[in-house]
């Protein structure tokens, strides 16, 4: 149902009885004029066809009544008759639904056909005034086919009776209508102005005609009048305008100034309106939209673009080089062209209490000047100098919002400057005495009662150690505690003279010596320990005579003989004992033959070396030393004895035969046991001696020649 039709029904209630009295005589005429438009589908029930026949005389009566008024109001009865027909159709639909079970789709189609038949019935009564739009609509309606036949559903309901015990009661909201608010509240509303009234009974949406009228009112009419208070010029003015005014007033919540649209404009708009059924039929005659063809993905080709490379471009001003010379910052220079140093910012000095009081009490009551007391006041750059007030003006009562000052008692005298008043006020204050406690350090007022307590650490005493973790005394097999090992008495320290005498014993035998005599065993042990612990003292001996040439080889032999003269070291009983490994390893030792360990593993080209050793050179280092001593004794005439060469500076005696004869005796007495600290040195000497023996024949050949 169109909203314009509903409004037309509401606005003209006085014309309803005229058009609502149908005559039975006109039923046959309407059926003869338009038999096509009243044809109902065959499948419809009987009661639906009866209702259609009943509506026909009403439509005819409406068309006749609409012809009587003048042409200006001819459009209104049409809309009214349509509204009544549609209203009548609506009233008969529930009755038809109660009589038989017909589908709601058939009823809607039936109502549409009835409403579309109304403008077609007015053809014979008014053929001359028919517009082209009406004829086009009639032709379009004729092209529509009959509705499809629907099979009747004759199944009867055999279930239990359906009952709806619920009842609905409508409760009206307070203040929705003018009659609902209490009388006292109405008085308050009447007293206050500018408050919008209550909303209307039912807010109906504006139709297209009302919207067009409201929008085109300002263009068509120049004179403005208040719609809320303007009286209607025509006595037959309908309630349609009032309803539009109420709707506009509710939306804008204020007074709206608009002019009523002219009647000619309204008539044209109503004539041009098309019904919904005609628009639906027109849209159905249009063809369906063809779907767009889908794109074939195989036809799409990928475009290969060159790979973009990132290049870093220097921006203007990023570096100092890119900034133009005109825009570069130039440092400030003096007359000589040297850059000026930045001036140090002067920090404002903190104000004292007296200065703060002076500044705060500046605008308060100023006493009369008695004598100008000059007191120097330190003023910083931050506090600007106060300008003198004009003579006629009074000092303001307050300078700060948070301070409340007393009213001024007297106006300042002529020529009075606020600085003088501040100085006078500051001079009246006593001088601040220095607090002796200012320089003292802050003492803690909180006294702690913590005391230091000595606590024994766990394990510090044997009592605090658990029995499982205490050290057990070493016991023997019988369970007796082992006696502590006797500490060896440390040997007496020897002076440098005693050591020199012990070392040079074999070289010189001085007649008058007061050195203590030690046993050979003790002396050898002491000497070996001292040599191992401390380095031997360096003695500077006089150089050999220039006419006797000495060879490095002879010096080495002399040193070897000197090392043999050292006493024997007492063997340590625990030295040869194997070290017991507490960690038991499961690794098994495998014996592998080393190259040269047996005669079979020696290559044939090295066999002659072994044969030479068997014949001449012994394999042990002891025999090598003995052989070296023999070779030294068998030197040809002209070669000097190495012992004589070394002991020449120490011994003043000319005879050297005794020392040469004593050396084999000492060697026979002392076995070839080398001290522990000289073990590595002996091995090194053996290797050097083997090289020297090979070079001995060459040296002998040179000496003989």
Swiss-Prot record:
Disordered: annotated span: 1-211, 226-493, 527-705
GO molecular function: calcium-dependent cysteine-type endopeptidase inhibitor activity
Modified residues (N6-acetyllysine): 28
Compositionally biased intervals (Polar residues): 275-286
An annotated GO cellular component: cytoplasm
Residue spans of biased composition, Basic and acidic residues class: 7-17, 24-62, 173-194, 234-248, 289-317, 327-352, 365-381, 430-489, 571-625, 683-705
Superkingdom, natural source: Eukaryota
Cross-link Glycyl lysine isopeptide (Lys-Gly) (interchain with G-Cter in SUMO2): where in chain: 10
Modified residues (Phosphothreonine): 115
Chain positions with Phosphoserine modification: 65, 202, 230, 352, 354, 361, 428, 504, 515, 563
Entries under Pfam families matching the protein: Calpain_inhib (PF00748)
First and last residues of every Inhibitory domain repeat: 149-202, 292-344, 434-487, 571-624
Domain-level remarks: Each of the four flexible inhibitory domains can inhibit one calcium-bound calpain molecule by occupying both sides of the active site.
Its job: Specific inhibition of calpain (calcium-dependent cysteine protease). Plays a key role in postmortem tenderization of meat and have been proposed to be involved in muscle protein degradation in living tissue.
Family statement drawn from the similarity comment of this UniProt entry: Belongs to the protease inhibitor I27 (calpastatin) family.
Protein name in the entry: Calpastatin
Lineage: Eukaryota, Metazoa, Chordata, Craniata, Vertebrata
Gene encoding the protein: CAST
């Amino acid at each position: 149902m169109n909203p314009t039709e509903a409004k037309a029904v509401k606005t003209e209630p006085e014309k309803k009885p005229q058009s609502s009295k149908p005559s039975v005589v006109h039923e046959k005429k309407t059926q003869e004029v338009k038999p096509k438009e009243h044809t109902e589908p065959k499948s419809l029930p009987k009661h639906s066809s009866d209702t259609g026949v009943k509506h026909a005389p009403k439509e005819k009566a409406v068309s006749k009544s609409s012809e009587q008024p003048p042409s200006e109001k001819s459009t209104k009865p049409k809309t009214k008759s349509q509204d009544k027909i549609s209203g009548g159709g609506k009233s008969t639909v529930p009755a038809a639904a109660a009589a038989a079970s017909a589908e709601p789709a058939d009823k809607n189609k039936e109502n549409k056909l009835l409403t579309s038949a109304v403008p077609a019935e007015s053809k014979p009564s008014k053929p001359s005034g028919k517009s082209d739009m009406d004829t086009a609509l009639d032709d379009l309606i004729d092209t529509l086919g009959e509705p499809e036949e629907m099979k009747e559903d004759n199944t009867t309901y055999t279930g239990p009776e359906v009952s709806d015990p619920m009842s609905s009661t409508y409760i009206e909201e307070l203040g929705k209508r003018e009659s609902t608010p209490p009388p006292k509240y109405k008085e308050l509303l009447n007293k206050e102005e500018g408050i919008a009234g209550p909303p209307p009974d039912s807010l109906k949406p504006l139709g297209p005609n009302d919207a067009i009228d409201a929008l085109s009112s300002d263009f068509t009419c120049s004179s403005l009048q208040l719609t809320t208070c303007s009286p209607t010029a025509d006595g037959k003015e309908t309630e349609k305008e009032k309803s539009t005014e109420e709707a506009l007033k509710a939306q804008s919540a204020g007074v709206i100034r608009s002019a009523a649209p002219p009647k000619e404009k309204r008539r044209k708009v109503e004539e041009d309106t098309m019904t919904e059924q005609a628009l639906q039929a027109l849209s159905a005659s249009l063809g369906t939209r063809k779907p767009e063809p889908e794109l074939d993905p195989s036809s799409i080709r990928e475009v290969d673009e060159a790979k973009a490379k990132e290049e870093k471009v220097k921006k203007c001003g990023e570096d100092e080089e890119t900034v133009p010379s005109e825009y570069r910052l130039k440092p400030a220079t003096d007359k000589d062209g040297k850059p000026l140093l930045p001036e140090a910012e002067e920090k404002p000095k903190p104000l004292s209490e007296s200065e703060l009081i002076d500044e705060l009490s500046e605008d308060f009551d100023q006493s009369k000047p008695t004598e100008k007391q000059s007191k120097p006041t330190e003023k910083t750059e931050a506090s600007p100098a106060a300008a003198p007030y004009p003579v006629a003006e009074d000092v303001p009562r307050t300078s700060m919002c948070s301070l409340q000052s007393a009213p001024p008692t007297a106006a300042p005298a002529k020529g009075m400057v606020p600085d003088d008043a501040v100085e006078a006020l500051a001079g009246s204050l006593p001088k601040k005495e220095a607090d002796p406690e200012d320089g003292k350090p802050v003492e803690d007022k909180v006294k702690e009662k913590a005391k230091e307590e000595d606590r024994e650490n766990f394990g510090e005493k044997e009592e605090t150690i658990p029995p499982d973790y205490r050290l057990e005394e070493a016991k023997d097999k019988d369970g007796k505690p082992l006696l502590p090992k006797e500490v060896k008495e440390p040997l007496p320290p020897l002076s440098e003279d005693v050591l020199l005498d012990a070392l040079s014993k074999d070289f010189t035998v001085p007649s008058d010596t007061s050195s203590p005599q030690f046993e050979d065993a003790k002396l050898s042990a002491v000497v070996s320990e001292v040599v191992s612990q401390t380095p031997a003292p360096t003695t500077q001996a006089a150089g050999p005579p220039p006419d006797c040439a000495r060879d490095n080889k002879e010096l080495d032999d002399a040193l070897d003989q000197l090392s043999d003269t050292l006493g024997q070291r007492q063997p340590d009983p625990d030295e040869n004992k194997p070290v017991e490994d507490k960690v038991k390893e499961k690794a098994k030792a495998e014996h592998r033959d080393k190259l040269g360990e047996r005669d079979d593993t020696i290559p044939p080209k090295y066999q002659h070396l072994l044969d030479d050793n068997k014949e001449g050179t012994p394999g042990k280092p002891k025999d090598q030393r003995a052989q070296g001593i023999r070779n030294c004794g068998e030197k040809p005439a002209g070669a000097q004895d190495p012992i004589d060469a070394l002991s020449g500076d120490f011994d003043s005696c000319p005879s050297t035969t005794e020392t040469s004869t004593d050396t084999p005796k000492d060697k026979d007495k002392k076995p070839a046991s080398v001290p522990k600290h000289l073990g590595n040195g002996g091995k090194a000497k053996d290797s050097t001696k083997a090289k020297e023996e090979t070079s001995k024949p060459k040296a002998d050949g040179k000496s003989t020649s």
